[in-house]
């Protein structure tokens, strides 16, 4: 069972409306919210679930990483796409590529803040999905806190996070950038025009944390990756 026969063990993620299963699949849960002081603490009377199966496709990011890699190494990069377009799959493979290195690139120390368990799918401290040989993972940790923890404990060259959603995430990444760490992250938007209408992105541009933007689109049934300066 996903809960390990213990509702208490999954109470934190369940209160946020999802569960993470072994192997990386994610289960969205709907039901009646149990509120305390305006904060959801649990779900009862479960009415439906939605299973999202994680896919790992090795090698899809290799041409992209080669294109982005420059004389100073890998630049801080933001991945942009609407939900379901493959941001997390691409991000995970980029983490692998950067962590493992290649014949033309050195391996990098990569720190991953896997707040929702979708990147590494940790199970009892072991990644169920490949994230590279030189990767440290903080599982179930809020991004803003996790970035600071990695800076203190893991000596990363690159820090990767999935789905920037809050301003405190930006401030933590600004701290990392000021420490000389490269950043790799995703954000929801269909295109750059939509992104510029988001107040969070305006703040992100002001901080000048990211150098490159990768836009993911689906054209004729195939995913296309386009890069541009940010």
Enumerate the predicted regions with their spans.
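The conserved Walker
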Residues: 83-84
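P-loop NTPase switch/communication element
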Residues: 99-148
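Hydrophobic positions on the alpha1 helix immediately C-terminal to the Walker A/P-loop
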Residues: 90, 94
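Hydrophobic anchor at the beta1->P-loop junction of P-loop NTPases
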Residues: 77-79
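P-loop NTP-binding catalytic core
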Residues: 7-74
């Amino acid at each position: 069972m996903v809960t390990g026969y213990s509702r208490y063990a999954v109470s934190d993620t369940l209160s946020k409306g999802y569960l993470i299963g072994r192997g990386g699949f994610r289960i969205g849960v709907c039901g009646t919210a149990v509120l305390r002081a305006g904060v959801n603490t649990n779900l009862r009377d479960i009415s439906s679930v939605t299973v999202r199966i994680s896919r790992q496709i090795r090698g899809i990011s290799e041409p992209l990483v080669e294109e982005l890699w420059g004389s100073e190494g890998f630049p801080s990069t933001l991945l942009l796409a609407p939900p379901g377009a493959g941001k997390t799959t691409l991000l995970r493979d980029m983490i692998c590529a950067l962590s493992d290195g290649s014949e033309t690139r050195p391996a990098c120390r990569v720190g991953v803040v896997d707040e929702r368990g979708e990147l590494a799918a940790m199970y009892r401290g072991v990644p169920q999905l490949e994230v590279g040989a030189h990767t440290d993972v903080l599982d179930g940790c809020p991004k803003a806190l996790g970035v600071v923890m990695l800076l203190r404990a893991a000596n990363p060259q690159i820090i990767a996070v999935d789905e920037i959603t809050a301003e405190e995430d930006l401030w933590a990444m600004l701290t990392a950038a000021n420490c000389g760490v490269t950043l790799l992250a995703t954000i929801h938007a269909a295109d750059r025009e939509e992104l510029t209408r988001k107040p969070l992105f305006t703040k992100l541009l002001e901080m000048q944390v990211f150098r490159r933007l990768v836009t993911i689109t689906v054209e004729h049934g195939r995913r296309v990756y386009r890069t541009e300066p940010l």
